[in-house]
Amino acid sequence: MSSLIPIVIEQTSRGERSYDIYSRLLKDRIIFLGTSIDDQVANAVTAQLLFLESDDPDKEINMYINSSGGITSAGLAIYDTMQHIKPKVNTYAIGMAASMAAVLLAGGTGTRYALPHARILIHQPWVKGGIGGQVTDIEITAKELLHTKEKLAEIIAKHTGQPLEKVKEDSERDRWMSAEEAKAYGLVDVVVQPRERKKA
């Protein structure tokens, strides 16, 4: 898999230096979240956010998101770190920001962007696989899931300005949005238009 990650070679005063593409982007304060969110991904993104704050607490961070979502607790670790650190975090939806990734997109503390063909999805959290065990344990798990559902709706309402009840209603089923619809909803601030190219 690592052979699929491009390497960038730069000339320095000490000679050539090679970086994997993600490390090179990080040097420019760019974090790329381009996979589903699990604990390992959350740890890497959180570490990058903390490193960039340590490097320069007054300089903005740009996070590009192309993700189908993932584990809620892992996503909330990234979200809480974004809210905690001093640098503003600008978020960009490219391709898709679905489920937990849409929460991260909306939770940008700087400007929140969507590229023109990005698709954004909000919905309620869902559980993979079956839930088993004693009835009391299943009841405890169900209460925790309902608490998580409520918390995610509150986060989306906070960042979009939408009434909590509307967010809950809209999240009952998959709610896909175009970049423009996401802007109207309050998930993003700006739909990025293509750069003008000079004609030869």
From Swiss-Prot:
The keyword Transcription regulation does not apply. It is found in: Cytoplasm. The keyword Protease applies. The active site is at S99, H123. It comes from the Bacteria. It catalyses: Hydrolysis of proteins to small peptides in the presence of ATP and magnesium. alpha-casein is the usual test substrate. In the absence of ATP, only oligopeptides shorter than five residues are hydrolyzed (such as succinyl-Leu-Tyr-|-NHMec, and Leu-Tyr-Leu-|-Tyr-Trp, in which cleavage of the -Tyr-|-Leu- and -Tyr-|-Trp bonds also occurs). Keywords: Cytoplasm, Hydrolase, Protease, Serine protease. Gene3D superfamilies: 2-enoyl-CoA Hydratase, Chain A, domain 1. SUPFAM superfamilies: ClpP/crotonase (SSF52096). PROSITE patterns: CLP_PROTEASE_HIS, CLP_PROTEASE_SER. One of its GO terms (molecular function) is ATP-dependent peptidase activity. GO terms for cellular component: cytoplasm; endopeptidase Clp complex. It holds the Pfam family CLP_protease. GO terms for biological process: protein quality control for misfolded or incompletely synthesized proteins. Its EC number is 3.4.21.92. Belongs to the peptidase S14 family. Fourteen ClpP subunits assemble into 2 heptameric rings which stack back to back to give a disk-like structure with a central cavity, resembling the structure of eukaryotic proteasomes. Cleaves peptides in various proteins in a process that requires ATP hydrolysis. Has a chymotrypsin-like activity. Plays a major role in the degradation of misfolded proteins. This is ATP-dependent Clp protease proteolytic subunit 2. It comes from Symbiobacterium thermophilum (strain DSM 24528 / JCM 14929 / IAM 14863 / T). The lineage of its organism: Bacteria, Bacillati, Bacillota, Clostridia, Eubacteriales. The gene is clpP2.
